[in-house]
Amino acid sequence: GSRQLFDYTALGDTVNLGSRLEGLNKVYGTRILIDGTTRSQAGEGIEARLLDRVRVVGKRQAVEVWELLHVAGEPQTPLLGPELVALWNQARTDWDSADFHGCRDRLNDLLAKTPSDTPSFLLLSRAEDHIAAGTTTTDWDASVTLDHK
């Protein structure tokens, strides 16, 4: 008890981004998301997979969104094994280079092995949309723009 009352509030881009990432967990069906800066700083201490590059509300530059899969030294089993992470990474590479057919094929393979992987369903849906629309590399931007907080 003191007569002085302090109100501590965190503000700024970092806190806003953290809030956006927390909300994206619902979209991607994930538990913990981190940005590219955190991923880089963590180094070999974690296993993570790049889910997306996202432009959040109020920002022009896309932010890398990573799913934390496993912390080194922790007893739990990683969310995805190395084979599935490699398949996901190949699908992401296809996506980034606008090879939507390759992306679709790899994601179908991944989903045959782990049918409950929400990020794979989301990326597969986007790849199929771009195949249907005839998107080419000349009008391609691999990042996603969020229009809501």
Locate each region found by the language model.
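Catalytic-core segments of nucleotide cyclases and related cyclic-nucleotide turnover enzymes
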Residues: G1-N25, R55
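Intrinsically disordered, low-complexity, charge-biased linker/tail regions
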Residues: T136-K149
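Cytosolic regulatory/linker segments at or just downstream of nucleotide-handling modules
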Residues: G18, N25-G102, D109, T114-A133, ...
